[in-house]
A protein has these predicted regions:
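Helix-biased detector of long, well-ordered alpha-helical tracts
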Residues: 1-346
Length: 346
């Protein structure tokens, strides 16, 4: 695939974004602290003494999940990208462009779940739009913007990263790929590995969030920047973070934790788990003095984490140290999740 063309599916390539989108961002403003850039999930405004972080995503609803579970996932997709700012998630704006076939009970079940998650995390809905339209289809039933608020000291961003910072990763790769595929296509998993395997893989669905990861990380001043490894997974996330911050990386591939059920899923369906979408995997650049404490604090809450590399000078590039030696970290470009989902749907 050409880097200067639209992909068949998924996010556009950074080169296309840089040519078409990035040069045309409207009027400049001195209130913008962090604007659009690769590898940063949020934008930040200075509003008086406070800082506000914003992130926008599709509102993603898959009816076959069940509307309550689908809404849980949709909510966390929206809020995980702003939670990584280091500020506290507080507000939600939401646009619901509903398919005509959606029923009143389905909408009520969906919205009850959104409300429950908002109450759990202390988040208020402040405005929105709700309507049914022809031409609107699942799973993208609108969009939403999450807003987090805090002080200057709370804000994390690529400018805080320094040489020697440790790269900390939670849960491991392909969390979202495994959880979604096992729920959407249970028969494929049963056929490949049996019913117990399918149930174990489907249970990964509930780990597709970094809200708790970020809440713990916010308590450590040495956490300099965070990123949710969504599209193109761990490799894509690391690439985007290094590009956004202008630093190099040395990553020990064997140090990255991989859940056994995810390793088996990747082996059975023959995809690179490190290149696959992984909502729920937090990547953080952390002062070496705080890395051990953060990993322990996460582990105490049942969130596996490991230090898997370090930040180096930009001139040293982004390198992965694997079983076969050293190689360059490159952006995967195409996420294997979309290929598998299309194949399984046939």
């Amino acid at each position: 695939m050409s880097e200067d063309k639209l992909p068949e599916l998924g996010k556009i390539h950074p080169a296309f974004f840089d040519r078409v989108i990035y040069p045309k961002l409207g009027a400049p403003s001195g209130d913008i602290v962090i604007g659009p850039r690769h590898g940063v999930d949020y934008g930040v405004l200075r509003v008086g003494p406070k800082y506000m972080a914003f992130s926008t995503d599709p509102f993603f609803i898959v009816p076959s999940f069940g509307f309550a579970r689908a809404a849980w996932f949709g909510f966390h997709i929206v809020f995980c990208d702003v939670a990584v700012s280091g500020l506290t998630p507080r507000y939600l704006t939401i646009d619901l462009n509903l398919p005509p076939e959606m029923t009143e009970p389905e909408l009520e079940e969906m919205w009850d779940a959104v409300h429950a998650e908002a109450v759990k995390y202390g988040i208020s809905v402040i405005t929105g739009h709700t309507a049914r339209y022809t031409g609107c289809n699942y799973p993208m039933v609108g969009g939403a913007t999450s807003i987090a608020v805090g002080g200057k000291r709370d804000l994390r961003g690529p400018g805080r990263v320094k040489k020697g910072d440790r790269v900390v990763i939670t849960k491991g790769p392909a969390i979202e790929t495994t959880g979604l595929l096992a729920v959407l296509f249970p028969e494929r998993f049963v056929a490949a590995g049996g019913e117990a395997f399918q149930k174990e893989a489907a249970a990964v669905f509930s780990r597709m969030t970094v809200m708790e990861d970020c809440a713990i990380a916010r308590t450590f001043r040495g956490v300099h920047v965070m990123h949710d490894a969504t599209e193109c997974g761990v490799w894509g996330g690391l690439y985007e973070m290094a590009r956004a911050g202008g630093y190099g990386l040395r990553i020990e591939e064997e140090a990255i934790p991989v859940l056994p059920v995810i390793r088996r899923t990747a082996d059975l369906f023959r995809f690179d788990p490190f290149a696959a979408i992984s909502e729920g995997t937090l990547i953080a650049m952390v002062d070496k003095k705080d890395a051990g404490g953060l990993i322990k604090a996460l582990g105490d809450e049942g969130i596996p984490a490991a230090a898997v590399g370090e930040v180096v000078n930009a001139a040293e590039g982004q390198k992965i140290m694997g079983r076969s030696g050293e190689r360059n970290l490159v952006h995967p470009e195409v996420d294997p999740y979309w290929i598998l989902a299309a194949e399984f749907s046939k």
